Amino acid sequence: MQSIRRTRSLFTLCCRLVACMTLFASTALAQVKDFDSIKLYTLKNESGMTVRVTNYGAIISSIIVPDRNGKQADIALGYDRVEDYINAVDKPYFGAVVGRYGNRIAKGKFTLDGETYSLLKNNGENHLHGGAIGFDKVVWTVDEYVEGKSLTLSYLAKDKEEGYPGNLQLKVAYTLTDDNSLVVDYYATTDKATPVNVTQHTYFNLKGEGQGTILDHELMLNAKKFTPVDEGLIPTGDMPDVAGTPFDFTSAKAIGRDIGQQHEQLKFGLGFDHNWVLDKAGKDGELTLAARVYEPTSGRVMEIHTTEPGIQFYCGNFLDGRLKGKSGKPYVHRGGFCLETQHYPDSPNQTHFPSTILKPGEEHQSQTVFKFRRSN
C-alpha cells in the first residue's frame, strides 16, 4: 500500500511538474508580441557557406561552413525551433543581438546630463545585456531581404524601455559575401541622449556545434591590455598589460592552456569572461583585426575585424550539459565561445572609458566582420 501511495505521489508530482513547465512555456510564448510574424531567413553564397537568421532577437541560428576536406558543419550553437529560444529557462543569448547596452552596467544605474536612470537589475545587483526584455527577446521588423545575400532588420526601443532614456531606432544588417565573410552593420539614432552598446552574441565551436569543448581552439587577440573585473564582473577601471598573465593572447595559444591557472581574475570569471582593449592602428571607426581562431582538427579559421574598441571573450563557463541544442545535442561545459565586439562594460559609469553616449542628431555606426577560411 505504501508503495502504491509513493507511486501515486510521484505520478502526481510529475504531472504537476509537466503542467508547470507547460504553463511556463505558454506564458513565455504569450509574452512575445507578433509571434506569428517570426520567420527564418537564409543567406547562402557561391563558396558553400550558409547563414540562417530569425527576426526574433535578430538571432543567428546557424552558420554552416566547410572544413579543410570540404565537409560542412554548423559551427553556431543554438536551437532547432524559435520556441526553444523563447522558452529557455537559462538564457544563454545564443546567436542574439543584445542591447540597448551589451554587457554589464554596475548596480543597474547611471547618471547622464544630471539625471540618474535606474535600469532593471537582471544579473544580481547589476544590469546585463539590456535587461529582462532586451533586443534578444523582441520581434524585429524585416526592412529588406535580398534573397540569399542580405537581411536588414529594425527595432524601435521606446523611451524608458528597461529604464533607458530616449526612443532609439536601431537597424542591423547581415550580409554574406562570396569570400565567406559575414558582415554585421549596426545603425542607431535617438531623440534623447542615451548609452548604446550593441553586439552579437553567437557561440562558436569550429569543430561543429555539440562536438565537445573548445579548449583546443587556438586563439589570438589583437590586444595588449584588458579590463580586470571585481567579483560581480564589473570593470575595476584599470587597464593593465596582459604580458605575463593567462590573459596574454597576443600570440595564438590554445584556449585551455592557461585557463586552469590560479589567478584571481579567472576565479571571478570562472574562466575567461573579460573585455580586451583592442590595439587600434587606424582612426576611430576603421576596421581592424580583433581576433583569429584556429581549430586544428577541422582546419577551420575564423577572423574577426571590427570598428569597436573592445572585445569580450567568453568561453562558455556557464554551459554545463543541461542545455540541449540542435538535434538534442548537449552543450557541455566550455562547449562554445563568444567573441563580442563592443565598447567596454560599465562605460556609462567610467568616464575614462570610450564614450557610448549617442545624442540627438548623431548616428551610431558600427561594423563587425566574421571571415571564415580553411587552413591546410
Question: What is each model feature region?
Answer:
Residues 1-12:
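N-terminal secretory signal peptides that target proteins for export/translocation
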Residues 11-14, 29, 199:
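Intrinsically disordered, low-complexity regions enriched for glutamine and histidine
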Residues 31-376:
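An exposed, glycine/acidic-rich loop-and-rim segment of catalytic or binding clefts
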Residues 14-26:
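Bacterial N-terminal signal peptides
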